[in-house]
Design a protein with these regions (language model features):
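Flexible helix-coil linker/hinge segments at domain or subdomain boundaries
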Residues: 134-141, 180-192
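Radical SAM enzyme core and accessory elements
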Residues: 176, 185-237
């Protein structure tokens, strides 16, 4: 009695599904009665709508994550992510109008042709979202929390950037420090992916079947749940 469950979709590009809203309608036919909330993963802002918000907030408001991808329009164009600030603003405006007081913005760091200006653009984008929130009417005392979530770019085979160099761990750490120095609001929180884990991911992405014995040996030496920072044993790897 009084308990609540959450169905969370963790797939990629969920909002691309042609019948997503029909699926949400079907789930909501019983979810609200059974106190089950629905949550979606990182969303493309160009596919985000007020209708989508309404269908995922019937029990409670779960987190919203928008894939902003890069800090500047120049870099978003380089990686062929057709996301504009106008679309980001529209998505956040819809969310704030529906009562959301926190959003997460997903970015990548270490992208080809990236400069410090692009890193600064990540902080600038988050600040613009904060400013957008306070430009709208809200109940007194309601504040906003914008979380920047930054992953490290890893070149993958059979992609346009497969032959691009991956940023060195030292370079990524410097960029992460620079990003933190560009954030000046307590309304903005920064989370970033561990560069050492990304280095291993790059090794696995470029490797072949000859890596299988390495992975098995690491397992035998106690490397379990390496996606969790507290369990990651880089020295063992």
């Amino acid at each position: 009695v009084g308990s609540e469950m959450c169905i969370r979709d963790s797939s990629l590009s969920t909002s691309d599904h042609s019948r997503l809203e029909d699926i949400l309608d079907e789930l909501n036919s019983w979810a609200e009665t059974d106190h089950v909330s629905l949550s979606l993963p990182s969303l493309r802002v160009d596919n985000f709508s007020q209708s989508l918000v309404e269908k995922t907030t019937k029990v409670r408001k779960s987190g919203l994550t928008f894939a902003a991808e890069a800090g500047t329009q120049r870099l978003r164009d380089v990686i062929n992510k057709n996301v504009t600030w106008d679309q980001i603003e529209r998505g956040c405006r819809i969310a704030f109008a529906e009562g959301y007081t926190s959003v997460k913005l997903y970015f990548m760091m270490g992208l080809p042709t990236e400069t410090l200006e692009d890193i600064k653009g990540i902080a600038d984008t988050a600040q613009q979202v904060v400013d957008l929130y306070y430009s709208m009417e809200h109940p007194k005392g309601k504040g906003v929390q914008v979380t920047i979530s930054v992953a490290c770019f890893v070149p993958k085979p059979d992609t346009p950037f497969q032959f691009c160099a991956q940023d060195r761990r030292e370079s990524l750490r410097e960029k992460q420090k620079y990003l933190l120095s560009c954030v000046h609001s307590r309304k903005i929180k920064v989370n970033y992916h561990d560069s050492t884990t990304s280095f291993l991911e790059g090794v696995f992405a470029k490797g072949d079947r000859r890596l299988a014995p390495v992975i098995l040996e690491a397992y035998k030496r106690g490397c379990y749940f390496d996606g969790w920072e507290e369990c990651f044993k880089y020295d063992t790897w």
